[in-house]
Each structure stands twice: as C-alpha cells, then as structure tokens.
Amino acid sequence: DIVNFRNVTASGTATAFSLPCMFSHLPRARFNIDDSYQSENLLDVMQKAGYDVLWMDNDGGSKGVARRVPYIDLMKEGNPEFRNGDTFFDEVLLDGLEDRLKNISKDTVLVLHMMGSHGPSYYKRYPDAFRKFAPTCDSAEIQNFPTEEIVNTYDNTILYTDHVVSGAIDILKKFPQYEAGLLFVSDH
C-alpha cells in the first residue's frame, strides 16, 4: 500500500540544515543547527533501542546525522557501473540492497540518501534513458536557458527518482517475511 502525506513541507532550503532538522526531536521553529550536534537524533535513538542502523550515502554526506551509526559513502565505494563523472546515479543505492536484506537478522533501518533532483546541474542527475522530457538544459548555467528546458530537465530528475524509489519498493516486495516499510521524504 502507498500512502501519500500531502501536508508536508521541508524544514529548509539546503541539505545542511534540513537534514539534521528532519532527524531531530525538535520542531522546525525551535531547531538550531549548532545545538543539533550536541543531542541525539532519531538514528541514535533507534540504534540505542536495538535496531541495526545503516546510512548509505549518495549525496555528499549526512550533515552529521549519521556520525554515530554505520555509514557507507557510495560516492567513494559505489559500483562504477553507476558512475556519472564525479558522482553516481542514485541507482547505486539499489546495487546490493537485495543482498543486504537477505542478511538482516534483527530490526533494521536503512537510510538511502539520494542525490535526487539537486540543482543546478539537473541534467547530471539521471541517465540518458530517462531523458523523456525535451528539450533539456544540459548545463549548470540555468539562468542562460528558457524556463521550458529547465522544467523539462527537472521533470526528468523526478522521473528517475520515481524509478529508483519504485526499484526499492520492488526489492522490498521480495521479502514478504519482513514487516518492511519505505518512507520517501525530500529534504528540500
């Protein structure tokens, strides 16, 4: 079953702020980035409660959220098949996921930190097979391109993100023995 939470807003416009806020016990109005480093976050609490926790990162770091839990930096350790210049396509997060799930022996939380639709280099966020909306803006200098091309390029990132999330759901469906769930949240 898929549930769409409609009344959800990001807590900030940059990953460096919004990600720690999302995992904090504090509401946005009381959240302070400096204080967040002095307190436990949701992952810390889950780990202390006995869950295995693993952060798999394809977006340049957890911004301190995963500093006390096991962490895999896929931008350094990712399968070269998914390499795109100096980054990786988000499908790298699915590579090996099925094998990880086969080896789960207790309650587990896996965080798949995606690159998603980060701009302004939207054109670098999806493989050519997902270039469905055209013409596209194939540059980080988006101010030099028509709005239609920027929107098309962004829409291609959404199409690809949907593909990756769908892939994760398909992998989870292979494990009916688990009471599994997938929560997709954009940090900004």
Question: Predicted regions span which residues?
Answer:
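Active-site-proximal alpha/beta segments of enzymes that process anionic O-linked groups
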Residues: D1-D138
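A generic fold-level signal
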Residues: A14, I104, N152-T153, Q177
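Active-site-proximal segments of metal-dependent phosphoesterases and phosphodiesterases across multiple
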Residues: F130, T147-V164
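Short, flexible loop segments at boundaries between secondary-structure elements
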Residues: T136-N152
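Metal-dependent active-site segment of extracytoplasmic phospho-/sulfohydrolases and closely related
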Residues: T157-H188
